[in-house]
């Protein structure tokens, strides 16, 4: 919604273990470097979009490796064509009660493409910054 109103957008994710994905506590997941990196990118996005008129920075997907990383170390990336999360088959259960789907993180590292978002985070341990566009059809339509 923000993007459709002309407001710059950042989707920021921190690499975590599957069992910690729903954690909101900094005790189980270290949010310190992710917070630092997010602050840095907020400033960069505002400067690029509003001062330099660089539209490529209007909508970014930012993925941050876990651990003690250099928050200034990043790569502009593209979306990898394999899944990072794999849903697990749910057990038999009472369908009248809420259930949280479980998943595993399953990356085929040998099939990763150099410069992709997953490869950059998982192998090179750099922040992945992927420009996203809301207009995903303009270029494709010209091929029909």
Predicted regions and their residues:
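Secondary-structure boundary elements
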Residues: 3-10, 44-54
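Glycine-rich phosphate/pyrophosphate-binding loops
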Residues: 3-26, 30
């Amino acid at each position: 919604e923000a993007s459709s109103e002309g407001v710059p957008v950042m989707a920021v994710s921190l690499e975590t273990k599957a069992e910690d994905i729903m954690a909101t506590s900094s005790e189980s997941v270290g949010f310190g470097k992710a917070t630092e990196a997010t602050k840095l990118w907020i400033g960069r996005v505002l400067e690029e979009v509003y001062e330099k008129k660089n539209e490529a920075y209007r909508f970014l997907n930012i993925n941050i490796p876990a651990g003690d990383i250099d928050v200034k170390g990043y790569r502009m990336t593209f979306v990898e064509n394999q899944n990072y999360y794999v849903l697990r088959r749910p057990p038999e259960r009472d369908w009248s009660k809420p259930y949280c789907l479980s998943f595993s993180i399953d990356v085929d590292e040998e099939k990763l493409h150099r410069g992709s978002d997953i490869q950059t985070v998982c192998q090179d341990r750099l922040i992945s910054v992927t420009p996203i566009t809301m207009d995903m059809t303009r270029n494709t339509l010209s091929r029909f």
